[in-house]
């Protein structure tokens, strides 16, 4: 398949009764998804496959659904549980593609070219690149023309403890206890 979308995650508002949430991108296996529920207060909980939810349509180009488990009344339902795992009202459901960063395609010398597995391997690499880009898109970055010499902290973890990120008079990364005109302990 050609990879025609850069979507790697979907986000939804829950209402306490919805149990089905779509993911609009290809995954190869059910375990290729990470499902996180964020509470109204901001705490995040990563849910567990087959305990809190099940996945449909792994392997299809168009995606599928995450079905949170609850008491459907029919124990043969794939998403049946005696415990209600549906996200509560005002919670946010985030579904992320999260592939294992490995390459499992093996070519055997003198065998016919395995076009399907080769295409899947290329798709997997593209998906991994998209996941990395999605993470980079959520980071603080310097502009391409920035002349900062090092984006690394040279200060030890002990020296950074209880301080805030800052830029020094040269524009380099630094840590300080000063915030604006306030100077002192960050706990006060």
Give residue spans per PLM region.
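N-terminal assembly/attachment segments of tailed bacteriophage virion structural proteins
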Residues: 1-122, 131, 135, 152-175, ...
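Extracellular/surface-exposed low-complexity repeats and stalk/linker segments enriched in Gly/Pro
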Residues: 137-155, 185-188
């Amino acid at each position: 398949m050609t990879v025609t979308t850069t979507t790697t995650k979907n986000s939804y508002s829950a209402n306490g009764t919805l149990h089905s949430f779509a993911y609009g991108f290809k995954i190869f296996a059910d375990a290729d998804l990470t499902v996180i529920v964020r509470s109204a207060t901001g705490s995040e909980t990563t849910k567990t496959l087959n305990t809190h939810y099940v996945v449909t349509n792994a392997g299809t180009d168009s995606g599928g659904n995450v079905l949170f488990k609850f008491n459907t009344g029919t124990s043969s339902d794939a998403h049946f549980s005696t415990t209600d795992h549906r996200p509560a009202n005002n919670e946010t459901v985030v579904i992320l593609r999260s592939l294992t960063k490995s390459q499992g395609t093996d070519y055997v010398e003198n065998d016919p070219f395995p076009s399907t597995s080769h295409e899947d391997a290329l798709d997997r690499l593209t998906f991994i690149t998209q996941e990395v880009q999605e993470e980079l898109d959520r980071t603080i970055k310097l502009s391409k023309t920035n002349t900062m010499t090092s984006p690394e902290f040279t200060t030890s973890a002990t020296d950074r403890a209880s301080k805030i990120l800052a830029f020094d008079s040269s524009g380099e990364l630094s840590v300080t206890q000063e915030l604006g005109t306030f100077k002192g302990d960050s706990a006060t």
